[in-house]
Amino acid sequence: MSIKGVPTDAARPMADLIVAGEHTVASRGLARQQVADLTLFAFAAGESVSEERYPADTVYVCLEGTLAVTRGGEQALVPAGSCLRVREGVGHAVSGVGGSAVKFLQVNA
């Protein structure tokens, strides 16, 4: 698997690798292979993604802010530095908590 967009010269905070403009959702693919997809996301305050389903397990790693993952009407909070797995095929939506901006890494494998 080839990973791109991650510094090799010096360590940097992962959250600094992506920025969302006002009223936007930004994404940056780091790797896309048959075995796994790694994508950085930055949601501006108040932005969200409605329910989606993936054919593989999804791991969310929150980098800044608090990510809300809603599955079957139940919301799980993922604060910065924490992670949560959603099993394959389970519909879920993601957003920042309380209308705040959030940055996270999404891993599908």
Give, region by region, the residue ranges found by the protein language model.
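Conserved short histidine dyad/triad with adjacent acidic residue
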Residues: H23-T24, D37-Y54, E88
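Structural motif
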Residues: T66-A68, Q75, G91, A101
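Short acidic-glycine-tyrosine-enriched beta hairpin
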Residues: G73-G89
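Ligand-binding loop in jelly-roll beta-barrel domains
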Residues: E88-A109
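A short, N-terminal "cap"/entry segment at the start of jelly-roll beta-barrel domains
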Residues: M1-V35
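Short, conserved beta-strand element in jelly-roll/cupin
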Residues: A42-A44, R53-V69
